[in-house]
A protein has these predicted regions:
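Thiol/disulfide oxidoreductase modules built on the thioredoxin-like
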Residues: 101-105, 113-156
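Sec-dependent signal peptide recognition
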Residues: 2-8
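N-terminal "domain-start" segment that seeds a small globular fold
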Residues: 16-44
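Short, conserved active-site loop motifs that form the nucleotide-linked donor/cofactor pocket
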Residues: 81, 107-108
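Structural microenvironment flanking redox-active thiols in thiol-disulfide oxidoreductases
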Residues: 65-102, 113-119
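C-terminal motif of bacterial Sec signal peptides marking the signal peptidase cleavage site
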Residues: 12-14
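Hydrophobic beta-strand anchors of alpha/beta hydrolase catalytic cores
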Residues: 52-53, 83, 129
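Short active-site neighborhood of thiol/selenol oxidoreductases, capturing the structured segment around
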Residues: 43-64
C-alpha cells in the first residue's frame, strides 16, 4: 500500500511540475496561419522575437482560474503586445463568450483552427503556457499558471521583451 501511495505521489508531483522543453521550434509558416478570434482575420506573429502563448478553451475550468494572471501579465510593461491566447479545440462563438464574461486585458486572442501550432509545439492539453524566444519554446508551464508563475515570468523574461 505504501508503495502505491508513493508511486501516486511521485506521479502527481511530476505532472504538476513546470517542464522546460528546449529545442522545440515553431515553424514560421505555422505562426502566420493563425486567425484572430474576434474577426477571423489572418495574423502573422512569425516575426515576433518574444511571445507568451497560452493554449486554452472556454470549457476548461483551470483556464478560467488562470485567466486573471494572464490579463495582469498582458498589462505589465514590456508584455503588452507579447501575450497570445490560442483557442484549442473550441468554437469561435464559445471563445467570444469567454472573453465577454472574463475580460481580455491586452491579450491577443487567436484561433489555431487545426490545432497545428499546438500539436507541433508539443501541447499536452489545456491550459498550457509557452515562453517563446525567436521561435524556440524556452519554457513550458503545464497546467494553470499561478501568482508565483506570473512573478517568475515577469522576473525571468522581462529582459527578453526589449
Amino acid at each position: 500500500m505504501k508503495i502505491k501511495l508513493l508511486t501516486l505521489a511521485l506521479f502527481i508531483s511530476f505532472c504538476s511540475q513546470n517542464i522546460v522543453d528546449e529545442g522545440i521550434f515553431i515553424e514560421t509558416s505555422d505562426l502566420n496561419s493563425l486567425k484572430t478570434l474576434d474577426t477571423g482575420e489572418n495574423i502573422d506573429i512569425s516575426e515576433a522575437d518574444f511571445l507568451v502563448i497560452n493554449y486554452w478553451a472556454s470549457w476548461c475550468l483551470e483556464c478560467i482560474e488562470e485567466h486573471p494572471y494572464l490579463i495582469e501579465l498582458s498589462k505589465t510593461k514590456g508584455f503588452e503586445n507579447a501575450v497570445y491566447m490560442l483557442s484549442f479545440q473550441d468554437s469561435r462563438e464559445n471563445g467570444l463568450k469567454f472573453i465577454s464574461e472574463y475580460g481580455s486585458g491586452n491579450i491577443n486572442y487567436l484561433v489555431d483552427e487545426n490545432s497545428k501550432v499546438a500539436i507541433y509545439s508539443g501541447v499536452f492539453g489545456v491550459p498550457e503556457t509557452h515562453i517563446i524566444k525567436n521561435g524556440e519554446v524556452i519554457k513550458k508551464y503545464i497546467g494553470p499558471i499561478s501568482l508565483n508563475d506570473l512573478q517568475e515570468i515577469i522576473n525571468n523574461y522581462s529582459h527578453l521583451t526589449n
